[in-house]
C-alpha cells in the first residue's frame, strides 16, 4: 500500500507498506535503497546504495538506428498537426517522442564522454551538468511551443541538434549514420514552405547542416 503524504512543515513522504515476506525481494529490486532504521534487525546484509542500474548505457548499433528512426519518422506526425492547425496533436508527438529521442541521443553523447559511468537522472534532470552551455541553451529554446510558428522553429532546431549529436555519437561508436535525415529534412522544409509561405529563418543553416553531414 502506498501513501503520498505532505506534512504541515512541507516535508513530503511517499510511504509504502508491504508484508514482511516481501522484504527480501523489495531490497533486491532497487539498488538505490538506503536503510535508515531496522529496529528488529531483520536485514542480515549490508545495503550500500548505488545508482549503477541507472547509468547511461552504451547503445548497440540497432538501438542507435532505432533512436534515429523514431526521431525522424515521427516528425511527419508533428508536421501533420501543424499543417492541419491541430496544435495539441503536434505538441504531443513532439514532446512524447521526438524530444524524448533527442534527449536519449544527448544522453549517449554524455555517456561516451564520461565512460558510461553515471546517470543523468530521471527525466534527464541532471543532463545540464554534462553538456555545453550552448547545447543546453539551444535545447531549452525548443520548449517554447505557444504558437504554430514557435513549434516550427523548435522543430527545425531539434533537427539541427539531433543531426549534430547523432552524427557525433555515430562517429565515436563507429556506427553508420542513417539516411532518414535527408528525406525527412526535405519533407519538413517543403511542408513549411507550402503551409506558411515562408522558407524559414533557419533554412540556410538547416541546408548547410545536411550538406555537411552528407560529406562526412
Outline where the language-model segments fall.
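Residues in flexible loops and secondary-structure boundaries
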Residues: 21-23, 44-45, 55, 135
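Conserved catalytic core of two-metal-ion nucleotidyltransferases
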Residues: 1-26
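NAD(P)-dinucleotide binding in Rossmann-like oxidoreductases
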Residues: 26-40, 95, 99-101
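A short, charged helix-loop
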Residues: 32-66
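Short, solvent-exposed coil/turn linker segments
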Residues: 19, 37-38, 147
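Surface-exposed beta-strand edges and their flanking turn/coil or helix-capping segments
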Residues: 18-20, 27-32, 50-51, 104-105
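Short alpha-helical interface patches
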Residues: 20-29, 155, 159, 163
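Conserved nucleotidyltransferase catalytic core and NTase-mimicking acidic/glycine-rich helix/loop elements
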Residues: 55-215
